């Protein structure tokens, strides 16, 4: 019996001319144990990743069924190699399966894009805790509330807490160095603990009430505030009673405006609804945290029809012996919706927060999936298929949201594909698959020659590809020389492409857009000729009169006459979209680089100030401006700064 984790050798590249894959011999060697299997084609590319409670039974089902759908039969015909990994349990198989799906993106699996982590609202561990937006790994040091479906949902909750409880949002360095209240105190959004305008005890109570509100204990918080108001009134402290009364009024307004879960029910709930149309799908995830509906987020899977057909085979093969099953049409929308929902739950929650309750639009049949989620969460996870009351209303909202998001997505895809086609025709690119049109666009950004940066943004598959964007720090040029900057970035980018071509792994775009006119295009042409690349790929985007959108001119490096497309051109709309994204990406990087240089460079120039001392100074005085405003005596109070060094710092900065 193979031990857990045992796996077959990696997939070799198989010559298609060799004998067909001997499935029978391979299946005979498989164990009847839980595990994960991978199918590979003759080129070694992964076709499908699946899990099984019985590897032998599952894999053999693909090769013994006589009524396979055309899509499954097509995949099976491509199988040239199988790898398997034995695990200890079905839960382990589920986890490994979804990790492999995310890593390998197989052609026949339903895939959801691995989104960045969800945002949280954080209350810091401080004598006067700070309320902050947070995205990333959580720890036990601070309090985290969420996750939230979007940054907007976090900031909306922060605005509510600022209005009702007036918690601070400033950085600790700012808090430690304030001598008078900020504007937020004047507009009644902060109680100014920085200048002791509120006692530590009262501020702690406000923090506790805010946390209770976020955790869904709205009635308890309301009662606490009412008791506090009555105590102030009984003590004839009418001004304080009026302040608490205003808090109660603001909180009542919030609770009236938002749908709140009934008392006694779980206050953290996710609502999942699936919509399908024309081979496309949307999963709409609505989040309820602390009994409050925070909004929703739409997810759009790929490989929908191929993946759903094969998932159906997997589910049927995994039914225990003796259990009755009803055959379903491979393209049945209800079955596809269930398969898509199960794929989303598996891929989404196995590394995310799992709420106690999932309200779903379709049943979840996958054996062991909910058990695995419960084991991960360390508590019971309930799945509600036919909710009542507020949950029913939330599910109906989520279902409508899924339908609207899918309709909008299909409409956007149609218009974006039309723009891609128009650009290809305008520039003269001949492609059978428009999704393969790869466009790279370059822009240079600086302020009077300072902090020069170049950006490269990428467009393909009818969309901007943020994960492939690159920034380049431009060095060793005359400040403000945009031509030299463009030469440097193009040489650095496409020298790498030339080197990759020698290894048969080029990543060459079909169009290279340059934000500039004839001068910039001429520089690009020289670089491409030096590297032996096709200058026909180069297109400059020259700004029109008054820099108005729609008046741009396309400038070609290969001698073709310049082209003015006009404001109504679909091709120009796409060019402008890509060019503007390159400009945005470059300018944000340039600003960050410039700010960093201005905040640290003057301290770096002072002898005796290393990284640690510089960090202590900036933290103590809240930035370079605070350091410059400090006296010699104040500078000398910082750890590691002697009286002599403090005098030198003061002299250098003044």
From Swiss-Prot:
Keyword Plastid included in the entry's annotation: no
Coiled-coil regions listed: none
Xref: InterPro entries: GIY-YIG_endonuc, GIY-YIG_endonuc_sf, GIY-YIG_UvrC_Cho, Hlx-hairpin-Hlx_DNA-bd_motif, RuvA_2-like, UVR_dom, UVR_dom_sf, UvrABC_protein_C
GO cellular component, one term: cytoplasm
Domain UVR: start-end pairs: 219-254
Gene3D superfamilies (UniProt xref): 5' to 3' exonuclease, C-terminal subdomain, GIY-YIG endonuclease, UVR domain, UvrC, RNAse H endonuclease domain
Listed GO biological process terms: nucleotide-excision repair; SOS response
Pfam families: GIY-YIG, HHH_5, UVR, UvrC_RNaseH, UvrC_RNaseH_dom
Keyword Ribonucleoprotein: no
UniProt keywords, alphabetically: Cytoplasm, DNA damage, DNA excision, DNA repair, Excision nuclease, SOS response
Location of the protein in the cell: Cytoplasm
One Gene Ontology molecular-function label: DNA binding
Ranges for domain GIY-YIG: 32-110
Entry function: The UvrABC repair system catalyzes the recognition and processing of DNA lesions. UvrC both incises the 5' and 3' sides of the lesion. The N-terminal half is responsible for the 3' incision and the C-terminal half is responsible for the 5' incision.
Self-association and partners: Interacts with UvrB in an incision complex.
Family membership: Belongs to the UvrC family.
PANTHER family linked: UVRABC SYSTEM PROTEIN C (PTHR30562:SF1), UVRC/OXIDOREDUCTASE (PTHR30562)
Protein name: UvrABC system protein C
